[in-house]
């Protein structure tokens, strides 16, 4: 069995920044540090931070007074921000800047009273945060659609004064079809010059298409609640290659590889490389050879840290 590695894979700039914010807050202020929602959707990362003193909660009413709170990379609604401010909580915002970009777009449509359509998955924390940027008191409304059927059934007030945005971690192919359906139904709809799916999601989906074409089985390292990791598995399967989403080497089943000569490995944007290395070592123990890195798009994007953590971490 030969191992092939997708390129790029694993951590993106937004995930790197979010994890580093929690780590630096722990270093500078000491535990406990409260984090609203899992800072990124990866079991290994969350457990590591929990062991260092991070406490993960789903709502601010689980947070005591006079503590530090970090908002996860997925972003939060304006109501959550207002609740934190009203309680005087010290907040560090680990929202991915590319998610913040979508928040700014939605807030602008809200101020203009322009109806907005969000393409995304119901219940995902990024979607909840983005929907929560819209203030309907200005006369508009925000709607959530997941697929073409939702578009066909959507009723809006003013079809000539619409705009759309997208969740950042969607399937590019699926989203393109939904956007086409929106434009067909609402010819005057506005939106970003390109969809809001982030560079890392696009790059990893392009890479897994290449990987699936050169593999008999594809392994996607990522947690089950990771949207972008699930999209990678689905994409490999659509390419006709069996694919499995795994948290790490402990999830591997030897029977998956009985008929496989080429095993492809990729990782979602919230999965650390150490987990990929663990998978490679287990496969090698079962007789796999090599670990060929496929050609791919180089990523050199970084996002800045909050000023207080940048300065105090140098003391």
UniProtKB/Swiss-Prot annotation:
Pfam families (alphabetical): LYTB
EC number(s) reported in the record: 1.17.7.4
Cofactor: record remark: Binds 1 [4Fe-4S] cluster per subunit.
Catalytic site: 126 (proton donor)
Entry keyword annotation includes Metal-binding: yes
Swiss-Prot/TrEMBL keywords: 4Fe-4S, Iron, Iron-sulfur, Isoprene biosynthesis, Metal-binding, Oxidoreductase
Gene Ontology BP annotations: dimethylallyl diphosphate biosynthetic process; isopentenyl diphosphate biosynthetic process, methylerythritol 4-phosphate pathway; terpenoid biosynthetic process
Residues noted as binding [4Fe-4S] cluster in the record, renumbered to the chain: 12, 96, 198
Catalyzed reaction equations: isopentenyl diphosphate + 2 oxidized [2Fe-2S]-[ferredoxin] + H2O = (2E)-4-hydroxy-3-methylbut-2-enyl diphosphate + 2 reduced [2Fe-2S]-[ferredoxin] + 2 H(+); dimethylallyl diphosphate + 2 oxidized [2Fe-2S]-[ferredoxin] + H2O = (2E)-4-hydroxy-3-methylbut-2-enyl diphosphate + 2 reduced [2Fe-2S]-[ferredoxin] + 2 H(+)
Pathway in which this enzyme or protein is active: Isoprenoid biosynthesis; dimethylallyl diphosphate biosynthesis; dimethylallyl diphosphate from (2E)-4-hydroxy-3-methylbutenyl diphosphate: step 1/1; Isoprenoid biosynthesis; isopentenyl diphosphate biosynthesis via DXP pathway; isopentenyl diphosphate from 1-deoxy-D-xylulose 5-phosphate: step 6/6
Binding site for (2E)-4-hydroxy-3-methylbut-2-enyl diphosphate: 41, 74, 124, 168, 226-228, 270
Cofactor: [4Fe-4S] cluster
Positions annotated to bind dimethylallyl diphosphate: 41, 74, 124, 226-228, 270
Residues binding isopentenyl diphosphate, per UniProt: 41, 74, 124, 226-228, 270
One GO MF term attached to the UniProt entry: metal ion binding
Alphabetized CDD domains for the sequence: lytB_ispH
Key word Manganese present: no
Protein function: Catalyzes the conversion of 1-hydroxy-2-methyl-2-(E)-butenyl 4-diphosphate (HMBPP) into a mixture of isopentenyl diphosphate (IPP) and dimethylallyl diphosphate (DMAPP). Acts in the terminal step of the DOXP/MEP pathway for isoprenoid precursor biosynthesis.
Family, as annotated: Belongs to the IspH family.
Name recorded for this polypeptide: 4-hydroxy-3-methylbut-2-enyl diphosphate reductase
Originating organism: Pseudomonas putida (strain ATCC 47054 / DSM 6125 / CFBP 8728 / NCIMB 11950 / KT2440)
